[in-house]
Structure formats: C-alpha cells, structure tokens
C-alpha cells in the first residue's frame, strides 16, 4: 500500500530517488536470501514453487516458461529476467538508474565516479555477461557476493550522502579515577 501511495503522490525529487534506490537494493538482498534458502534443494522440490510465490513471481514465471517448473529456470528467472521487477538484474539496473539521477549525471561522458555506482555496475555486468550454462556453478558463492555488494553499496552511500559527525561521550570513571572522554563517529 505504501509503495503504491508513494509512487502516485510523491514528487520526483531526491527523496523519491533515495526511496527507489533503497527499495531496489533491499529487493536484491531479499531475493538473494530467498535463493540462498533453496540452494541445496533438489531440482524437482516443491520448495521452488514456494520461492516463486514468496517473491510474487509464480504467475509471471509460469507465463514466461509455459508452466515448466525447473530449478535452473527458477534461478535464471529470479536472477536474470530483464522484465520482472523483482528479479535481481532488474533491481540492480533500477538502483543504478536511480543513483545516476541522484548524481544528476544520467548521460555522463565518464564512467562510474562514485563507489556505490561502481559496485552496482560491476554486479549488474557480472550477471549480464555470465557465460550461458554457468549460472548454477558456484551459485551460493555468487549469491553471497551479491549480498556483500548490497552491504558495501549501503556503506558507500552512507559515506557519500549521510556524513556523520564525531561524537564525544563523557563518562564517570567511577571512584575518584577521573573523567574519561570517549571519541568516535556516529
């Protein structure tokens, strides 16, 4: 409900772009977690149907693959489909686009200038140019790498846009030992 209301009423300013960017990164992370939960399952396990339903992808998958349920195709669909909004590839591309708009450089002559932009582009291109048939090889490692990318992108965005101020905490050291000053960053 919130997503529909936000999409239909919010101005397309930086706040909206941050919301879309965050939602896309979170969608990548959650889809990776869904896939990681099924990596060890057999190809004919009914758990793959559950995975598709959990992602709201069951009907679209059935239309795309004409009803043939296969673990390899489910993984391919959830990772690489360019038209399904909850696939990892689609979400990475959406996150890249949102970040380009935030940087006010959608058609820059230079490549990635921000760390988050570089990380998103690398993750997307690794999926996009994956060798045919290599998708299921070391799937758990590839998914763990995507999860790490989501975490790294979040940290890069925090450093780039949300500057933290150093904090000072005064604590009583106890029984006549003086005052201790602790410093760090929020």
Give the location of each predicted region.
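Alpha-helical transmembrane segments and their helix-helix packing motifs
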Residues: 1-186
């Amino acid at each position: 409900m919130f997503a529909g209301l936000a999409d239909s009423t919010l101005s397309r300013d930086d706040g909206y772009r941050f919301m879309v960017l965050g939602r896309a990164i979170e969608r990548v992370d959650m889809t990776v977690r869904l896939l990681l939960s099924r990596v060890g399952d057999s190809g004919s396990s009914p758990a793959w149907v559950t995975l598709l339903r959990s992602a709201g992808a069951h009907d679209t998958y059935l239309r795309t693959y004409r009803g043939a349920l296969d673990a390899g195709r489910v993984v391919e669909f959830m990772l690489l489909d360019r038209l399904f909004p909850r696939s990892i590839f689609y979400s990475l591309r959406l996150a890249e686009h949102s970040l380009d708009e935030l940087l006010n450089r959608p058609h820059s002559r230079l490549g990635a200038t921000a760390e988050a932009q570089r990380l998103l582009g690398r993750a997307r291109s690794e999926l996009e140019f994956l060798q045919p048939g290599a998708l299921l090889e070391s799937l758990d490692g590839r998914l763990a790498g995507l999860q790490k990318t989501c975490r790294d992108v979040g940290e890069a965005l925090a450093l780039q846009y949300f500057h933290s101020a150093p904090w000072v905490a005064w604590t009583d050291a106890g029984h006549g030992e003086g005052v201790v000053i602790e410093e760090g960053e929020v």
